[in-house]
Amino acid sequence: MSADTWDFWIDRGGTFTDIVARRPDGSLGTDKLLSENPEVYEDAALEAIRRFLGLSRDQPIPAARIGRIKMGTTVATNALLERKGAPTVLVTNAGLADQLRIAYQNRPELFAREIVLPEQLYARVIEATGRVRADGAEETPLDEARLRGDLEAVRAAGLESAAIVFIHGYRHHAMEARAGEIARAAGFAQVSVSHAVSPLMKMVSRGDTTVVDAYLSPILAAYVERIAAAFAGEARHKLMFMQSNGGLTDARLFQGKDAILSGPAGGVVGAAATSRIAGFEHIIGFDMGGTSTDVCHYAGAFERVLNTSISGVRVTAPMMDIHTVAAGGGSILHFDGTRLRVGPDSAGADPGPACYGRGGPLAVTDANVVTGRLRPEFFPAIFGPEAD
């Protein structure tokens, strides 16, 4: 920490953003804001930084006054839970269009009469003519002209991200790499190529992870750019994000596949550190936010997994062993005439639950207000049309 710079630790959730600031003199300050309040500020993290630095909302933040900003975010988590990622096309070999849908043929309810197929993150599939055998020999050359035409067509239809997954691509990736180049030339801002994202020999797990990366990375990139644009001077190198595995990474290296449990992973690290200070080595963590709830276990060491399923989506990447469900304080309450259903959609921070006074829907938080379980005196004055 420099003698004249500020450091910030930020937990940016789907509903609330919590901030800890270390002033140049070493003292600490905290703040809590709604993650989205467009009538008052553009972004909660930036608003908090400006408040601590004494800047108005239209003033750029001097990058020279910032030491480090370390952030955990549920931007990717909530985009996955609510299926609000970038429109994605899957590019794979001819004849393998249904490979990821068929997957391992697992059925969550073996004896159910109605078989409900899992929802896929990709909107379209392009079957590329071209194939490489397991020994690396080219069986069929890549039809570049046809692939280029197909990619340009789906790009014109509004798809923004491409996931390239070819058989044996984990080892022999020249054809995959060439397909990625064609996709970028066709105008796709985000191109996730399986041998770079998840170089694993099993095509299904490699493909699933690549699709997740393509689906979520544009959401993260847009958020990082929005943060960086608020600074006067280059600040990306000062911005770090928590990854799903509990470690920090430079904002410029933050990928969708590593961001799914960014916010929750920070909660696990924080809970473990807090429990050790209090003399506890064995804890169960319960982290209920506005959009999702996360449960973890800690017994003296962090528990990590390589393969996991989140909201019905399979991912193969190192991450904390956290169980996430789409149920939080902002989860919307639905009644279909026979039963009450909670979520998975959330009221978020804007408009938020009905009790926020912004015309939002009935949510879990409203039920807790009606039953008297929430005590207003413990909440900051950040609600309502005037955020007071």
Go through each PLM region and give its residues.
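N-terminally biased helix-coil "hinge/interface" segments that flank
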Residues: M1-D388
